[in-house]
């Protein structure tokens, strides 16, 4: 089985993106995976937020290589446990494996599962390629604003899920444990003041979600988790420092 890790970033992230590139390069080399790190965007009309370009990169890999699976990984994340194999998350009868952040209202849609595009697996099948094209075409008419607003392609992914577009439920496995491969870095308010409204994800940072940590649920990074994801406005001022710090904590064996 051939697996590729894919990530994309723009030059304004150069100050710290190299840390993630090196982190995943070492992990890929150790586990015999390919790594595709693209710096820059594809030409699109009209213009879209860089997050949308992840779809173009994944589709390019699927169409031009013999890769069996692509693991998309946002560039603001680090792999913390090099002993964990990507194969351990595979579901052979699925085309996409994507984690759920939990229940809440997302992009104006009430949902029992908010799917997160920060990290997910996609299999090299015709359905997957058709789905990526379909998702790319989604932001039009009343959804046109999501080309550059909100959570971009993730809003589209959740729309596809809630509307069961392209028989979504028959092709996609929803990983109930977001922390399986997408743990968010989070500091308690007494350590660093933060308003949840700044990045709109307060509903999965509630006291109720903290109870789920005992069952490996919830979304916040805990020591020993596979990946730490430095997403959100609260991370922006300290992202480079955090990534340098956590790069020294990787489990190699």
Spans of model-derived segments:
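N-terminal anchoring/stem segment of glycosyltransferases
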Residues: 1-67, 126, 253
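A residue-level signal for conserved active-site and pocket-lining positions in enzyme catalytic cores
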Residues: 5, 28, 58, 76, ...
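Short beta-strand/turn micro-motifs composed of small residues
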Residues: 7-9, 98, 229
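Short, solvent-exposed loop/turn segments at secondary-structure junctions
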Residues: 10-12, 42-43, 77-78, 102-105, ...
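Aromatic-acidic/polar surface patches that form glycan- and anion
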Residues: 13-17, 47-51, 109-113, 121-124, ...
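The feature represents the membrane-entry module of six-transmembrane cation channels
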Residues: 18-20, 25-29, 33, 38, ...
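GT-A fold catalytic core of metal-dependent nucleotide-sugar glycosyltransferases
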Residues: 47-132
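Catalytic core and acceptor-binding pocket of nucleotide-sugar-dependent glycosyltransferases
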Residues: 56, 127-253
């Amino acid at each position: 089985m051939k697996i590729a890790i894919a990530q994309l970033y723009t030059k304004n992230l150069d100050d710290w993106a190299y840390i993630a590139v090196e982190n995943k390069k070492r992990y890929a080399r150790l586990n015999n995976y390919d790594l595709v790190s693209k710096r820059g965007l594809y030409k699109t009309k009209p213009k879209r937020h860089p997050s949308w370009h992840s779809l173009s990169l994944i589709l390019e890999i699927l169409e031009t290589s013999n890769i069996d699976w692509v693991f998309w990984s946002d560039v603001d994340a680090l792999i913390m446990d090099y002993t964990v194999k990507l194969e351990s998350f595979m579901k052979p009868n699925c085309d996409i494996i994507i984690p759920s952040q939990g229940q809440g209202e997302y992009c104006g849609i009430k949902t029992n599962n908010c799917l997160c595009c920060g990290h997910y697996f996609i299999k090299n099948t015709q359905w997957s390629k058709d789905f990526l094209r379909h998702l790319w075409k989604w932001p039009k008419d009343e959804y046109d604003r999501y080309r550059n607003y909100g959570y971009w392609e993730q809003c589209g992914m959740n729309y596809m899920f809630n509307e069961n577009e392209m028989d979504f439920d028959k092709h996609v496995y929803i990983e109930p444990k977001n922390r399986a491969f997408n743990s968010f870095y989070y500091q308690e308010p007494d350590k660093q003041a933060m308003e949840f409204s700044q990045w709109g994800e307060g509903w999965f940072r509630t006291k109720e979600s903290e109870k789920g940590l005992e069952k490996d649920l919830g979304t916040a990074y805990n020591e020993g988790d596979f990946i730490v994801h430095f997403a959100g406005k609260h991370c922006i001022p300290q992202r480079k420092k955090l990534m340098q710090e956590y790069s020294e904590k990787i489990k190699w064996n």
